[in-house]
Amino acid sequence: LVLNEAAKESQTKIKSINLNIPAVDSLSVFSKSEIQVAGEMITDLHLKKAINNSDFFESLTDYEVMQKFIINYNVDDKIYYTNPSNNFGNILNLNFYKFAVKKNYVNTLIKLFNDININIEELIPTPLSSALATLNSDDKNLGAICIDLGDSSSSIAMFENNQLIFLDAIKVGSKNITHDIARGIST
């Protein structure tokens, strides 16, 4: 019904959408891979080896991975936020992050939109879309936490060095805060 109204008002037929996925009951997984480079110059081959030795490509039982990426690189305890190729070192670490939501929830939404002949082009975690809409490039580069306070939940997105590093949501929203304030005033 809402989509029909939107199509009527815009005088276009809605064929596809980008769909926000709430982060409540989501899963964040941090992992790491380490390889020895024995004083050699780091190349893309070393990076591929470190990625292949990790759980980066593994799926999560009952969860759909929405975002996965390398947070940073570590060469002999020095952190790099960009590709460390052409540097020399002994130990190369890659730090990974995966964000996932329950697979059944995602499948239900996909089926719902397929049933009304609307293609979902991309599933976007709600905290990420809120952050991209509100943070500028300086915020993301310097480091920022974007908290979107909703009625019954709040979503969180963290950026550092222009890189997303964490997404989550908690089941505390403005309704909870309002009730707490009212309770505090009444006593």
Regions found by a protein language model. Give the residues of each.
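Nucleotide/phosphate-binding catalytic cleft detector across ATP-hydrolyzing
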Residues: 1-144, 163-165, 174
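Acidic, glycine-rich loop-and-beta core segments that form the ion-binding/anion-interacting portion
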Residues: 137-187
